[in-house]
């Protein structure tokens, strides 16, 4: 009865609690089907077509990470972005022997609208499954709908910069893959990237937590720019025709 009341209340404000088993099941099936991100990336790397990438929301570079293996094996020139200091430090350590990998300790923000993130506090992190380490978000409700208690959440100030400034900072002139996992902010980053740059990489981003009105706007932009796209699990895979991603 208590859970039903909570779900009704959150529903009134446009939020929906996400069942943990649902998320786990989605990830389990997506990693074991023939058409999954790992197989697509492996095929692309074997053809030597993935030589540079930008990952926004890299976390520690290991937890739920699709790119670590490929970056290291194929020596892919990479810029990895992670705003949370403790995960940034783990990320640096993870790639310390790979000089072709650059790491940025910032969040990517549109119009400087993000200066903090919500996360499970260190003293409460062990109360939850491993996945909560990867659900840090600019919206507190994102954590709550994943089952995190409000009094277990802390708000931390972070550095941020725009996608344009990031590209200038690392002199990114060619890009084969943009991979975004920012727990709800993905759509804005991808939209701003497409609108403000001439780069046309393969783009992979989570779309489950994007508001429907904005997602439709993003789909219109992808169509306008002639991107093709399809969904795998909670991710949308987008590619310009010249990339031949599925061949």
What are these regions (language model features)?
Residues 1-247:
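Phosphate/nucleotide-binding beta-alpha loop and adjacent structural elements of enzyme active sites
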């Amino acid at each position: 009865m208590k859970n039903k009341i909570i779900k009704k209340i959150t529903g009134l404000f446009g939020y929906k609690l996400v069942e943990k088993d649902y998320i786990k099941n989605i990830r389990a099936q997506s990693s074991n089907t023939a058409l999954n991100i790992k197989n697509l990336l492996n095929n692309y790397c074997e053809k030597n077509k993935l030589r540079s990438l930008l990952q926004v929301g890299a976390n520690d570079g290991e937890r739920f990470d699709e790119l670590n293996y490929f970056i290291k094996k194929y020596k892919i020139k990479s810029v990895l972005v992670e705003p949370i200091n403790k995960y940034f430090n783990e990320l640096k350590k993870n790639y310390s022997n790979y000089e072709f990998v650059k790491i940025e300790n910032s969040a990517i923000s549109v119009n400087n609208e993000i200066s903090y993130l919500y996360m499970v506090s260190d003293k409460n992190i062990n109360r939850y499954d491993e996945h909560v380490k990867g659900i840090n978000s600019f919206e507190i409700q994102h954590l709550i709908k994943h089952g995190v208690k409000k009094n277990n959440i802390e708000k931390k100030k972070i550095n941020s910069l725009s996608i344009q400034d990031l590209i200038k900072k690392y002199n990114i002139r060619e890009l084969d893959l943009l991979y975004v996992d920012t727990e709800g902010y993905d759509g804005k980053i991808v939209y701003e990237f497409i609108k403000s740059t001439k780069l046309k990489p393969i783009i992979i981003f989570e779309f489950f937590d994007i508001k429907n009105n904005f997602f439709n706007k993003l789909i219109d932009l992808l169509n306008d720019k002639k991107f093709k796209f399809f969904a795998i699990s909670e991710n949308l895979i987008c590619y310009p025709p010249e990339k031949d991603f599925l061949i």
